[in-house]
Swiss-Prot record:
InterPro entries reported in the protein's UniProt record: Aromatic_Lyase, Fumarase/histidase_N, L-Aspartase-like, Phe/His_NH3-lyase_AS, Phe_NH3-lyase, Phe_NH3-lyase_shielding_dom_sf
Pathway this chain belongs to: Phenylpropanoid metabolism; trans-cinnamate biosynthesis; trans-cinnamate from L-phenylalanine: step 1/1
Entry-linked NCBIfam families: phe_am_lyase (TIGR01226)
Gene Ontology MF terms in the entry: ammonia-lyase activity; phenylalanine ammonia-lyase activity
Family: Belongs to the PAL/histidase family.
Main location (coarse class): cytoplasm
Assigned GO CC terms: cytoplasm
Gene that produces this protein: PAL-2
Position(s), cross-link 5-imidazolinone (Ala-Gly): A209-G211
Keyword Signal found: no
Lineage of producing organism: Eukaryota, Viridiplantae, Streptophyta, Embryophyta, Tracheophyta
The UniProt record lists the keyword Phosphoprotein: no
GO process terms (BP): cinnamic acid biosynthetic process; L-phenylalanine catabolic process
Protein name: Phenylalanine ammonia-lyase 2
Location(s), subcellular: Cytoplasm
């Protein structure tokens, strides 16, 4: 008799538990379940603080397995750092790198057949050759197919910050000793980075599978001294390969690539993952910044602070939402504006809305999932920049070359598409808040367009800024469309599916730039709103003092010196002052 569904589930559950306990006992987790779970534990804010601390460190030490998004961003932004930052290679990696390089040379001499060493490339891998060095030289030649504009910073040249980051990521991969390349080549690339010399790479031309072949070939072209190779020096001047080597202090002349070395340099996801690292470093900071801006928005809008109540968010269970609410609650705690708003809400409560609009009240619920997406993408990219992502992989311990597809940059394309959608959602909420802030129908007593001029018929404040914000938000929403569903079969249908990782990362970089524009505009508007609330507070204080003094003189004592019942009108008059929107004069037709 066949077992029931319930029996099957019970048996499967016991098997899973036995396997799990066995894995834990032997310290063997083949799918890294526990590591993946641990990576998303803890506070997102603490993670961002740690990222900023790492970004500020003067040295990036590479060993192949501990590179972070913040370190990649640090190398990318070396132009903007007063003290610079240097890369150091782990000497302990030298032996493993040398072993894989020696294995390739030994296998070549023994006649072992390996892809890209004795064969052609891609769809033409059926071809064979014994001229391994010449094969690598021609690999670089045919991959140098990029198109550049005029000048060192043309719109068709990859930003030099991204190039430096890509060199760092590629070194980190090659240090792990599975790629068959000499350690001296990695040292030369390190010298280029430390001298702030960036090879000129084309902005476009890669599908990030098989890796970022075309752009990475220009790094290889500089190392081998190809005549078309150009670089940009520390002062922004254009250098040829010979000048770049001299400035960087690379001695011994250009490299004559040995078998597999050209493939090791170009067949990886370094450019896409480097750009993604830069994007995610900034995205994490922008997400935290918007949590702060949302709290300020609640403050200047006289919002009801209960939207951050811990029980509400605890019952929803989502960690991003819980932390966003906690951060906003911390910022609002003790705010004099919040206390003043509480008094206003208690005055004539039945004549006012019971709760705030969604842009304020549900901001933690809206932001939380976006923050979780950005955080998950950050972890995915950190795994990618510490991965070995070329082909074939040299396994010296088993004396074999493994042919696979780690060059497929799907983690980059998917994480960047998701990040871009999260950024667009953040921008959407920001625009909704901005629209409420400048609209006197919604902003609880602030002047229309946040104007503070004497003549409201001439001063229109943030009207132009609101139009600009609409433009930014529209473009940001367009960029939220995915890139990865636009795959085209490439290279004679060998690369019939590809990740489009760098393209997606580039589009996400555009989204980050637009969100920066929105954030800076919004911050200025919030500062204006704070000033207006402070002005409102001061003016009300002056008016109330004046009303109180006049009331005491004119309403307290009668003609014959007796106490006048009208003295009790003082409290009512002061309440009228509190109820009145101070800036209502701006649209008063009188």
């Amino acid at each position: 008799m066949a077992p029931s569904i319930a029996q099957n589930e019970h048996i499967n559950g016991e098997v899973k538990e036995v396997l799990w306990n066995l894995c834990k006992k032997q310290n063997y987790l083949p799918l890294n379940w526990e590591m993946a779970a641990d990576s998303l534990r803890g506070s997102k804010l603490d993670q961002v603080k740690k990222m900023v601390d790492e970004f500020r460190k003067p040295i990036v030490k590479l060993g192949g397995e501990t590179l972070t998004v913040a370190q990649v961003a640090s190398i990318a932004n070396v132009d903007n750092k007063s003290n610079g930052v240097r890369v150091e290679l782990s000497e302990s990696a030298r032996a493993g790198v040398k072993a894989s390089s020696d294995w390739v040379m030994d296998s070549m001499s023994k006649g072992t057949d390996s892809y890209g060493v004795t064969t052609g490339f891609g769809a033409t891998s059926h071809r064979r050759t014994k001229n391994g060095g010449t094969l690598q030289k021609n690999l670089i030649r045919f991959l140098n197919a990029g198109v550049f504009g005029i000048g060192t910073e043309s719109t068709h040249t990859l930003p030099h910050s991204a190039t430096r980051a890509a060199m760092l990521v590629r070194i980190n991969t090659l240090l792990q000793g599975y790629s068959g390349i000499r350690f001296e080549i990695l040292e030369a690339i390190t010298k280029l980075i430390n001298s702030n010399i960036s090879p000129c790479l084309p902005l476009r031309g890669t599908v990030t599978a098989s890796g970022d072949l075309v752009p990475l070939s220009y790094i290889a072209g500089l190392l081998t001294g190809r005549p078309n190779s150009k670089a940009v020096g520390p002062t922004g001047s254009k250098l040829d390969a010979e000048e770049a080597f001299r400035v960087a202090g690379v001695t011994g002349g250009f490299f004559e690539l040995q078998p597999k070395e050209g493939l090791a340099l170009v067949n990886g996801t370094a450019v896409g993952s480097a750009m993604a690292s830069i994007v995610l470093f900034e995205s994490n900071i922008l997400a935290v910044m918007f949590e702060v801006l949302s709290a300020i928005f609640a403050e200047v809008m006289n919002g009801k602070p209960e939207f951050t109540d811990y029980l509400t968010h605890k019952l929803k269970h989502h960690p991003g939402q819980i932390e966003a609410a906690a951060i906003m609650e911390h910022i609002l705690d003790g705010s004099s504006y919040v206390k003043a708003a509480q008094k206003l809400h208690e005055m004539d409560p039945l004549q006012k809305p019971k709760q705030d609009r969604y842009a304020l009240r549900t901001s933690p619920q809206w932001l939380g999932p976006q923050i979780e997406v950005i955080r998950a993408a950050t972890k995915m990219i950190e795994r990618e920049i510490n991965s070995v992502n070329d082909n074939p992989l040299i396994d010296v311990s088993r004396n074999k070359a493994i042919h696979g597809g780690n060059f497929q940059g799907t983690p980059i394309g998917v994480s960047m598409d998701n990040t871009r959608l999260a950024l667009a959602s953040i921008g959407k909420l920001m625009f909704a808040q901005f629209s409420e802030l400048v609209n006197d129908y919604y902003n609880n007593g602030l002047p229309s367009n946040l104007t503070a001029g004497r003549n409201p018929s001439l001063d229109y404040g943030f009207k132009g800024a609101e139009i600009a914000m609409a433009s930014y938000c529209s473009e940001l929403q367009f960029l939220a469309n995915p890139v990865t569903n636009h795959v085209q079969s490439a290279e004679q249908h060998n690369q019939d599916v590809n990740s489009l990782g760098l393209i997606s990362a580039r589009k996400t970089a555009e989204a980050v730039d637009i969100l920066k524009l929105m954030s800076s505009t919004y911050l200025v508007a919030l500062c204006q709103a704070i000033d207006l609330r402070h002005l409102e507070e001061n003016l009300k204080s002056v008016v109330k003092n004046t009303v109180s003094q006049v009331a005491k003189r004119t309403l307290t004592i009668g003609v014959l010196g007796e106490l006048h019942p009208a003295r009790f009108c003082e409290k009512e008059l002061l309440r009228v002052v509190d109820r009145e929107y101070l800036f209502a004069y701006a649209d008063d037709p009188c």
